[in-house]
């Protein structure tokens, strides 16, 4: 089994070679080479021409009754690192600012353990590219990567959390991450001179009305004890002060804790856009792009079992957490396979996606121990 120092060295190497979505070639090569150094007696490694930076490793069980999936993401963010660490990113403008280097290292630690201690059931490790963008989980599913013996019966995955103590495990019944949808609205009217509004059709005025009406969607269409949010964060219309704008674009996001909620918000937003178009006699087009960022809805039965194990294990600091309104594309895979996502505390003052994020490395070995323990427990229960 990998020692804590070996795990830390793996993490630091991965931290130095961050790569953006679908460009994780150095990362992929390092993962392949590292796994090649493990006991191969019951490992089967699979790569994919159609998704070149994806990687699957199947640990064949002694007497498998199921295949348990474990997923980690491998991509990084377009952030210029400002930690000043000796093992900082060597790729300018790219950083593991969301902790995917931690995720990968924990997965490698768990994989290494089961390469030396053959599990009862099959365990499928999925090293997924393109979580931050490009819909890596959805892309893998639609390409048919999860088929035959490579199809998990249940799926697990973690995300690091700087707000939790190092090595703590956080989870909850229900939704862990919100689903997110990108919103683009284009209003097309008629430009003209500011002195003659009767000869134009002002898209800025229509956009202002639309933005105000959108504020009622959550307050009047969503159950107040649930959480949903529409943020229209960008508006671009007009060119100069004395010209009426013939085109205005609004961009924003929708976030909701269930897929049903997101679909309700989507439909209400369509109604508002249609109504504004009729009221102002102009074309209003709405583009909604959710991609793979579905809500991360934990399976009730599996999550109850997961929480029970973590609560009853003396070496685990378990914390029940609130849902996060940020997104995670593991939600798409959990809509296809039952499973559970959870937090691993990394205790840092900086937040995810920050240029100064410095996870506490003591979390790595504690995470490996907690997850291997749970998987051993799951195979007996």
Swiss-Prot record:
Catalyzes the conversion of N-acetyl-diaminopimelate to diaminopimelate and acetate. It catalyses: N-acetyl-(2S,6S)-2,6-diaminopimelate + H2O = (2S,6S)-2,6-diaminopimelate + acetate. One of its GO terms (molecular function) is N-acetyldiaminopimelate deacetylase activity. The keyword Ubl conjugation does not apply. This is N-acetyldiaminopimelate deacetylase. CDD domains: M20_Acy1_YkuR-like. NCBIfam families: amidohydrolases. It is an enzyme of class 3 (hydrolase).
């Amino acid at each position: 089994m990998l020692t804590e120092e070996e795990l830390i060295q793996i993490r630091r190497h991965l931290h130095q070679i961050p790569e953006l979505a679908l460009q994780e070639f150095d990362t992929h090569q390092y993962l392949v080479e590292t796994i090649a150094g493990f006991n191969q007696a019951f490992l089967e490694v699979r790569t994919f021409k159609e998704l070149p930076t994806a990687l699957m490793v199947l640990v064949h069980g002694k007497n498998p009754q199921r295949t348990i999936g474990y997923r980690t993401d491998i991509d990084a963010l377009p952030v210029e690192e400002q930690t000043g660490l000796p093992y900082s990113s060597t790729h300018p403008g790219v950083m593991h600012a969301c902790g995917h280097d931690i995720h990968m290292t924990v997965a490698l630690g768990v994989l290494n353990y089961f390469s030396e201690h053959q599990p009862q059931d099959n365990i499928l490790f999925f090293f997924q590219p393109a979580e931050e963008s490009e819909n890596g989980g959805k892309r893998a599913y639609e390409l048919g990567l999860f088929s035959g013996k490579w199809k998990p019966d249940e799926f697990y995955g973690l995300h690091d959390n700087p707000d939790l103590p190092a090595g703590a495990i956080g989870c909850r019944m229900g939704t862990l991450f919100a689903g997110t949808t990108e919103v683009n609205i284009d209003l097309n009217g008629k430009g003209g001179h500011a002195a003659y509004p009767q000869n134009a059709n002002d898209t800025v005025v229509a956009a202002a009305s639309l933005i105000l009406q959108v504020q009622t969607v959550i307050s009047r269409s969503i159950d107040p004890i649930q959480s949903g949010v529409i943020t229209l964060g960008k508006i671009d219309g007009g060119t100069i002060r004395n010209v009426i704008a013939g085109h205005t674009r609004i961009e924003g996001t929708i976030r909701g804790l269930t897929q049903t909620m997101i679909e309700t918000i989507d439909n209400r937003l369509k109604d508002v856009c249609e109504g504004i178009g009729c009221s102002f006699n102009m074309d209003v087009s709405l583009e909604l792009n959710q991609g793979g960022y579905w809500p991360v809805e934990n399976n009730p039965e599996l999550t109850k079992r997961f929480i029970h194990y973590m609560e009853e294990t003396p070496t685990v600091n378990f914390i029940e957490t609130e849902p996060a309104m940020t997104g995670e594309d593991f939600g798409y895979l959990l809509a296809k396979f039952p499973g559970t996502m959870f937090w691993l505390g990394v205790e840092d003052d900086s937040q995810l996606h920050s240029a100064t994020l410095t996870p506490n490395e003591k979390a790595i070995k504690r995470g490996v121990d907690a997850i291997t323990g749970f998987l051993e427990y799951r195979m007996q229960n």
